[in-house]
A protein has these predicted regions:
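Short hydrophobic targeting helices and cationic amphipathic motifs
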Residues: 13-16, 34
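Terminal targeting signals and extreme-terminal segments of soluble enzymes
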Residues: 33-299
Length: 299
């Protein structure tokens, strides 16, 4: 429990339209000036170093959630290190991440081949930091093969495009890493919306435009939203993601705009834990990733 507590992030969900107390007037600094001091995602990834038996990286403060890397970034870094240590992997099909402790300080990421079959490859990947083991993950890669089955039950939300939706990341004291993303609320509710269902559909994109078909970039973006359960919150509260499981539905997703639609729905929230599902949609209406998440909520 000590490690979980150390990795908590306090979501202060007061809207910017409310009067700002003097202690947080720094949020009045122009956004362009803030971004000029930030580390682009591509620069962050390029800074990963190869060691004898692992890859290492140190995170700047603008990529943190409180004092630790947020789950999506940790997942993306594990995938990047796995690719660097294993050439010619087929597309990622599924991954399971357990966030054991805070990802702080100099991070070391080691990937180990678990099994290589004719079409699928399983890799185990651990991330350690100053506090010990931070992330334990299993990644499954699989080559495409002919199939007589083609079925989909997922239905894309009928929402307006990002240009016609209001800004999403407009809270005071939101996590530092959120400034790396542009968000537009397409449906559902903002956190701390009294009486609303705990669900949201938000258009997301990296401010650092790059190869938007990269699964590493997509994982970092797919976990950028706060838990949907925080729609029900009445006060700011610390949260900590415990586990994150993803299934990749499109081996090579296409995206010409940079925008992805994240549809997050809280299934249950009780006894201090929330379970939710998130679906990531491409701009042309294809589901590319489904994720399940268990979150500890301290409040």
């Amino acid at each position: 429990m000590d490690r979980i507590v150390a990795s908590r992030c306090r979501y202060d969900l007061v809207h910017l339209t409310n009067p700002l107390p003097r202690t947080i007037k720094a949020w009045r600094v122009p956004i362009d000036n803030q971004r000029s001091k930030m580390t682009p995602f591509s620069t962050l990834i390029d800074g990963m170093q190869q060691n004898v038996d692992c890859h290492s990286i140190s995170l700047p403060t603008d990529w943190l959630q409180g004092r630790t890397a947020y789950g999506g970034l940790s997942a993306a870094l594990c995938l990047e290190a796995t690719h660097r240590g294993n050439e010619n992997l087929p597309p990622l099909r599924s991954a399971q991440y357990c966030f054991v402790g805070p990802a702080t300080g100099n991070l070391n990421i080691s990937a180990q081949m678990l099994r290589k079959g004719k079409s699928t490859t399983l890799v185990g990947c651990d991330m350690t930091g100053d506090s010990g083991l931070a992330v334990r993950s299993t990644l499954c890669f699989g080559a495409s093969r002919p199939s007589s089955h083609h079925y989909q039950s997922l239905v894309k939300p009928q929402v307006a495009g990002p240009d016609d939706c209001p800004a999403y990341f407009n809270w005071t004291a939101s996590p530092s890493f959120a400034r790396h993303f542009d968000g537009r609320l397409a449906a559902g509710a903002m956190p701390r919306t009294n009486g609303a269902k705990p669900e949201m559909s938000v258009w997301l994109r990296h401010h650092d435009i790059g190869d938007e078909t990269s699964m590493v970039r997509l994982l970092a973006l797919a976990d950028a939203l706060p838990p949907a359960a925080l729609v029900l919150a009445t006060d700011p509260m610390p949260i900590s993601t415990l586990t994150w499981s993803i299934d990749v539905l499109e081996a090579y997703p296409s995206n010409s705009t940079g925008w992805w639609l994240a549809q997050a729905t809280c299934d249950t929230s009780r006894e201090g834990y929330s379970a939710q599902e998130t679906v990531i949609w491409s701009p042309d209406g294809k589901p590319v990733l489904v994720a399940r998440q268990n979150v500890a909520i301290f409040g």
